Amino acid sequence: MKKTALYPCHEQSGAKIIDFGGYLMPVQYAGIIAEHKAVRSAAGLFDVSHMGNFFVKGSRALEFLQFVTTNDLAKVVDGQAQYNLMLYPSGGIVDDLIIYRMSADTFFLIVNASNADKDFAWLQQHIDQFEGVTLEDHTERLSLIALQGPLALSILNRLFPSIDGEALGSFHFCSASFNGFDVIIARTGYTGEKGVEMCVPNEAAIALWEALMAAGAADGIQPIGLGARDTLRLEMGYSLYGHEINQDTNPLEARLKWVVKMDKGHFIGKEACEQAMQHPQRTVIGFSLEGRALPRQGFTLYNSDRQAIGVVCSGTLSPTLQEPVGTCSVLREYGKPGTPILVEVRGAFHAGIIRSLPFVTNTSLA
């Protein structure tokens, strides 16, 4: 089992450790609800170093990435990042990822931990068509730290006085120096709150983590585990691979049509997307339940006649709303907000309604 460079920090903080994506990762520290509320009200620090990260380099790097992804990277400038998708020819999703343009011939990719090996192999499979383009896996060399919450940018400024996080702008990044090491600081996140995600060499990771915790101590910063990371992203309706998106889900079903630019050149899966637009079958949408029954992935959704209409993708008790919420994949005719549904939980039917996403709208990013 792998450990991130920050594993000693998690042990010292008394975190509960689990296996996630082949890494020993903290699922919680003080508790999922307390950590969730800390991020919504103040700030939290996340170790996301298990995420895969690759460099794509070469004079045809942009051309290569345009071919294997759906969004239009030609519109991205140096210092800017873009949310993107890789598709199979069938239109199913290989993975979702963020691509950072370092320069005209250098791009930095962050992919899901559970998909890192698969993604690297997928990219390697297609790279030979683009002479001179190289693919480098830096996952074992770099640590990724996310600082998120309404107070995150002011905490960042205490440690890096020359960086104005507000001025940097969403999905933009810059470079800074910490203890003689280069740090990439990006205005990205997975919580719905203001914040940054930082990439630093493993050698400097513990010192940076401790410095950020010290800088935010007066504001109540807390270390945050994967449990609260999941409840935070679910309240926002953000997709998680293996739940809302997978190899059998196309971007249109997953509410990710905005990431697919049909007016750019050819890309893998383009024809399948064109067909899916003509004959949409399902949609991923939110829902909530009455009572306290918790919906879990794989549970069946029914209409009022108890006919199966879909399946739960993700579910939890929302710490902010204090009610059971989730995402589901349903037949499109049942995907309108306000539609009554039933969810079978442990053999009993529980009433609910289809809800629009996000569930929580009054965040610091809103």
UniProtKB/Swiss-Prot annotation:
One biological process term in Gene Ontology: glycine decarboxylation via glycine cleavage system
Presence of the UniProt keyword Transferase in the record: yes
GO cellular component labels: glycine cleavage complex
GO molecular function, one term: transaminase activity
Keyword annotations of the record: Aminotransferase, Transferase
Uppermost EC category: transferase
One Pfam assignment: GCV_T
Catalyzed reactions: N(6)-[(R)-S(8)-aminomethyldihydrolipoyl]-L-lysyl-[protein] + (6S)-5,6,7,8-tetrahydrofolate = N(6)-[(R)-dihydrolipoyl]-L-lysyl-[protein] + (6R)-5,10-methylene-5,6,7,8-tetrahydrofolate + NH4(+)
Domain of life, per lineage: Bacteria
Enzyme Commission (EC) number: 2.1.2.10
Gene3D superfamilies, per the entry: Aminomethyltransferase beta-barrel domains (3.30.70.1400), Aminomethyltransferase fragment (4.10.1250.10), Probable tRNA modification gtpase trme, domain 1 (3.30.1360.120)
Biological role: The glycine cleavage system catalyzes the degradation of glycine.
Self-association and partners: The glycine cleavage system is composed of four proteins: P, T, L and H.
Family: Belongs to the GcvT family.
Stated name of the protein: Aminomethyltransferase
Originating species: Chlorobium chlorochromatii (strain CaD3)
